[in-house]
């Protein structure tokens, strides 16, 4: 089996750590920033090497589809991941990640997932919503993705939240600014949503996004 370079090992360790901490893997851009690699092509070269050597699986043209293999975890001294059990998460409708789409607080269905994907968050505190639109694509959140959301009425600046604005649910980054709140899309072609402090209510924030799930096209699995 081919040995990893020190750089490749550091990248692999970062991917595993971010996945376990945040509930989803880092993007190529985030890996580049962490490793001080300016070129996305440079990051891709390392990822291709990790995939070729059997330490990483990745989906085509998906920014958050990096999955470390069992071999990778053994190499990093983590051991094979134990099955932490399946949890059933209520599916509450769709999130408008573009033009807001009304999402009723009614459980449409439920999804069973490995609790590992929640990054340590108690499954009882989580609900799922399906994304509709393109406003968060630069954060690796795409139309049709399922978001795992931790129920909480508050958030830290810059966190990705699901917010209820004028009875419509939307997913944006949360930024309090002086006398207003800015809900920022991650798409340069779209404008933020502003809500004044006077109109802002704690119930506007439904929760914080802790994970993303995407079905890969063509039947490929990570």
UniProtKB/Swiss-Prot annotation:
Coiled-coil residue spans: none
Gene Ontology molecular-function annotations: DNA-binding transcription repressor activity; serine-type endopeptidase activity; transcription cis-regulatory region binding
Keyword Transport attached: no
Signal peptide residue numbers: none
Reaction equation(s) it catalyzes: Hydrolysis of Ala-|-Gly bond in repressor LexA
Active site per the UniProt annotation: 135, 172
GO (cellular component) term, any one: protein-DNA complex
DNA-binding region extent: 28-48
Enzyme Commission number: 3.4.21.88
HAMAP family hit by this protein: LexA (MF_00015)
Family matches, as PANTHER family: LEXA REPRESSOR, LEXA REPRESSOR-RELATED
UniProt record similarity statement: Belongs to the peptidase S24 family.
Protein name from the UniProt record: LexA repressor
Organism field: Myxococcus xanthus (strain DK1622)
Lineage: Bacteria, Pseudomonadati, Myxococcota, Myxococcia, Myxococcales
